[in-house]
Amino acid sequence: MNIKPASEASLKDWLELRNKLWSDSEASHLQEMHQLLAEKYALQLLAYSDHQAIAMLEASIRFEYVNGTETSPVGFLEGIYVLPAHRRSGVATMLIRQAEVWAKQFSCTEFASDAALDNVISHAMHRSLGFQETEKVVYFSKKID
């Protein structure tokens, strides 16, 4: 297995995996992907097996308060996706470890993430990667008249 940073040359592979994780339009994904590639505090990794992209990870450095953490800045897992045939093979663990090494370069001592309340598959994955649940939050909004 080979893990490498995403680049302009790997946009097609990254987009294919990203579409499986988040259901935005291709144009929206591509616009955000180009922005992320230029962002100093963003990391995008792709894992390959036999020249096929099998997993992706997106992480960032967050300087604002991150729920459940005690320090700042914090490495933050924005998203991770592994093709079903390659799950439970250790690829997600390898991606997370590389993201943690990257986050340490920014003096991070914590790595955080979030998941929807009803996404129990994501909760299980986070636990298997060493994350601990810290709190549950429900966000509210209201239109101002």
Swiss-Prot record:
Highest taxon of source: Bacteria
Keywords: Acyltransferase, Antibiotic resistance, Transferase
Entry keyword annotation includes Transferase: yes
GO molecular function: aminoglycoside 6'-N-acetyltransferase activity
Binding positions for acetyl-CoA per the UniProt entry: I80, Y81, V82, N119
Catalytic activity: kanamycin B + acetyl-CoA = N(6')-acetylkanamycin B + CoA + H(+)
UniProt xrefs under InterPro entries: Acyl_CoA_acyltransferase, Aminoglycoside_N6-AcTrfrase, GNAT_dom, YpeA/RimI_acetyltransf
EC number: 2.3.1.82
Major enzyme class: transferase
Alphabetical GO biological process terms: response to antibiotic
Sequence ranges assigned to domain N-acetyltransferase in this UniProt record: 1-145
Protein residues bound to substrate: W22, Y65, E78, D114, E135
Pfam families in the cross-refs: Acetyltransf_1
Record note on quaternary structure: Homodimer.
Role, per record: Catalyzes the transfer of an acetyl group from acetyl-CoA to the 6'-amino group of aminoglycoside molecules conferring resistance to antibiotics containing the purpurosamine ring including amikacin, kanamycin, tobramycin and netilmicin.
Protein name: Aminoglycoside N(6')-acetyltransferase type 1
Organism (species): Acinetobacter haemolyticus
